[in-house]
C-alpha cells in the first residue's frame, strides 16, 4: 500500500531539506546566496502582522562638551523611525499520487522519485525568489515579497515605503544615478560605479557587492580587455576571461531576473532578509509540512515547503543603484 512508504518519504524529505536543498537554491540566486553567506539573513519570531526596522532619520546634533560642574543634558536621542515591512509566506506543494508510490516501491526508486520532486521545488524557489528579491512587490496581486525595485526605485523621491513618503522623508531615499552612455556603450559605467560607491560609503563601511544583469556584466567585463593576458599556462590563446570580476575589491555578479540596465551596490549592514524561525544566517530558511492525505478528492499525499519573511532595509543612504545603463 502507498502509505507503507510514508516514513521513508518523510525522512528523506527532511534530510534533503536540511542538506543540499538550500545550497542548491543559493547556487542559482546570487542575491540570496550573498545574503546568506554574508550574515545578512536574520531570524524573525513570527509575532505581529509586520516586521519593523528602526531607521535613523538624522544624526544627533547635541554631543555635549562638559564643563566643570556643568549639568549633563539627559535629553533622549531623537531621529529614529520604525519602518514596517510586510512578511509574506511563499509555498511550493509537492504532490505524490498513490500510483506514483506504487510504481516506486523499492527504496532506491522511492528516493529517486523524491529527489526528482525536490529538484522541481529547488528550481521553483530559485526562479521565484530571484524574481521577488529584484521585483517591486506587485506580482501575484501583491502577495510576493517586496524586492529591491520597491526599496530602491529609479527616482528616489517618488513613491513611499513602510508608510513614509520619499518626497518628504529624505532619510528613506537610496542614492540613484543614471548610467546612460555618452557616445560608446558603457563609456560612463566605471565612473558611475565609482560615484555610487563613494556616495554610499560611510567611513570604512562600503558596498559589499555589485549585482547587475548579464548585458551590463559583459559590458563591465569588456572594460577589462587589454588589462590581462589572454593565454593559459600552456601558452595557448584563451580569449575568454575565467576569473571573477570585482570593483574596488568587491565582487561584481549578474543575475537573471534583474530589470535590464540596473546595477545595485549593496551592503550587508543595511539590507536583511528576515525569515521566520531562522537561528543562524547560513541555516536553511525552508520548512516542510506534511504529509496531507488528499482523499477523497485525490488519491495522493501532499507536502508543502514554505519560507516566510521579508527583505528589509535600514540605512537607505548606503544602498545605491545605477539605472538606465547603456
Give the role of each language-model region:
Residues 1-326:
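Flexible, glycine/threonine- and acidic-rich loop/arm segments that mediate assembly and lattice contacts
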Amino acid at each position: 500500500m502507498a502509505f507503507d512508504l510514508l516514513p521513508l518519504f518523510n525522512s528523506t524529505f527532511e534530510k534533503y531539506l536540511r542538506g543540499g536543498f538550500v545550497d542548491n537554491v543559493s547556487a542559482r540566486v546570487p542575491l540570496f546566496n550573498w545574503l546568506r553567506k554574508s550574515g545578512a539573513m536574520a531570524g524573525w519570531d513570527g509575532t505581529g502582522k509586520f516586521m519593523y526596522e528602526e531607521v535613523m532619520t538624522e544624526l544627533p546634533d547635541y554631543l555635549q562638551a562638559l564643563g566643570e560642574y556643568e549639568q549633563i543634558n539627559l535629553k533622549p536621542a531623537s531621529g529614529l523611525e520604525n519602518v514596517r515591512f510586510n512578511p509574506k509566506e511563499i509555498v511550493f506543494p509537492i504532490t505524490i499520487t498513490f500510483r506514483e508510490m506504487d510504481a516506486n516501491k523499492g527504496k532506491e526508486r522511492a528516493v529517486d522519485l523524491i529527489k526528482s520532486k525536490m529538484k522541481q521545488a529547488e528550481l521553483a524557489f530559485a526562479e521565484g525568489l530571484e524574481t521577488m528579491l529584484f521585483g517591486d512587490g506587485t506580482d501575484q496581486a501583491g502577495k510576493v515579497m517586496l524586492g529591491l525595485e520597491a526599496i530602491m526605485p529609479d527616482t528616489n523621491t517618488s513613491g513611499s515605503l513602510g508608510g513614509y513618503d520619499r518626497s518628504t522623508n529624505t532619510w528613506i531615499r537610496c542614492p540613484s544615478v543614471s548610467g546612460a552612455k555618452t557616445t560608446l556603450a558603457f563609456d560612463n559605467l566605471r565612473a558611475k560605479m565609482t560615484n555610487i560607491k563613494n556616495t554610499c560609503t560611510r567611513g570604512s563601511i562600503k558596498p559589499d557587492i555589485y549585482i547587475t544583469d548579464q548585458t551590463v556584466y559583459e559590458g563591465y567585463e569588456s572594460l577589462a580587455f587589454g588589462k590581462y593576458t589572454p593565454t593559459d599556462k600552456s601558452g595557448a590563446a584563451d580569449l575568454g576571461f575565467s576569473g571573477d570580476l570585482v570593483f574596488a575589491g568587491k565582487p561584481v555578479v549578474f543575475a537573471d531576473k534583474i530589470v535590464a540596465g540596473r546595477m545595485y551596490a549593496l551592503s550587508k549592514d543595511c539590507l536583511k532578509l528576515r525569515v521566520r524561525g531562522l537561528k543562524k544566517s547560513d541555516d536553511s530558511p525552508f520548512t516542510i509540512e506534511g504529509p496531507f492525505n488528499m482523499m477523497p478528492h485525490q488519491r495522493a499525499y501532499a507536502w508543502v515547503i514554505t519560507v516566510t519573511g521579508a527583505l528589509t532595509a535600514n540605512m537607505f543612504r548606503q544602498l545605491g543603484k545605477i539605472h538606465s545603463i547603456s
